[in-house]
UniProtKB/Swiss-Prot annotation:
Induction: Expressed as a probable monocistronic transcript in mid-log phase. Expressed more highly than the gvpA2 (c-vac) transcript at mid-log phase. Maximally transcribed in late log phase. In 'wild-type' cells (probably NRC-1/NRL) gas vesicles are seen at all stages of growth; in standing cultures, cells float. In this study gvpA2 (c-vac) was not detectably transcribed, while gvpA1 (p-vac) was transcribed at high levels during log growth and decreased in stationary phase. Presumably most to all gas vesicles are derived from this p-vac locus. It is found in: Gas vesicle shell. Changing D24Y: Greatly decreased interaction with GvpF1. No gas vesicles. Major component of the gas vesicle shell which is 2 nm thick and consists of a single layer of the protein. It forms 4.6 nm-wide ribs nearly perpendicular to the long axis of the vesicle. Modeled as antiparallel homodimers. The ribs form a low-pitch helix rather than a stack of hoops. Interacts with GvpF1 via its N-terminus (residues 1-43) in early growth stages, none of the other GvpG1 to GvpM1 proteins were seen to directly bind GvpA1 in H.volcanii experiments. Might interact with GvpJ1. Might interact with GvpG1, GvpH1, GvpJ1, GvpM1, GvpN1 and GvpO1. GO terms for molecular function: structural molecule activity. Changing I61A: Mini gas vesicles. Residues 23-31 are annotated as: Beta-strand 1. Residues 35-43 are annotated as: Beta-strand 2. The 'chromosomal' gene (c-vac, gvpA2) is only expressed during the stationary phase of growth, while this plasmid encoded gene (p-vac, gvpA1) is transcribed constitutively throughout the growth cycle. HAMAP family: Gas_vesicle_A. Residues 32-34 are annotated as: Beta turn. Disruption phenotype: No gas vesicles are made. This is Gas vesicle protein A1.
Amino acid sequence: MAQPDSSGLAEVLDRVLDKGVVVDVWARVSLVGIEILTVEARVVAASVDTFLHYAEEIAKIEQAELTAGAEAAPEA
């Protein structure tokens, strides 16, 4: 059997840390129409620099959503 190529694994790990991987999970379990479990998770695997850039972009998106929601709300 051939040994796994450690340089290939190192390259994959380097790319994952450089680019980052985000796994976004949403699941709901219901029994007879009654929700018994909801799972929401976001897992990020990245270098600190990549994660900070990702967090900044997510904050911009959330701020834009809040601004759009405030503009759409009718004034009293």
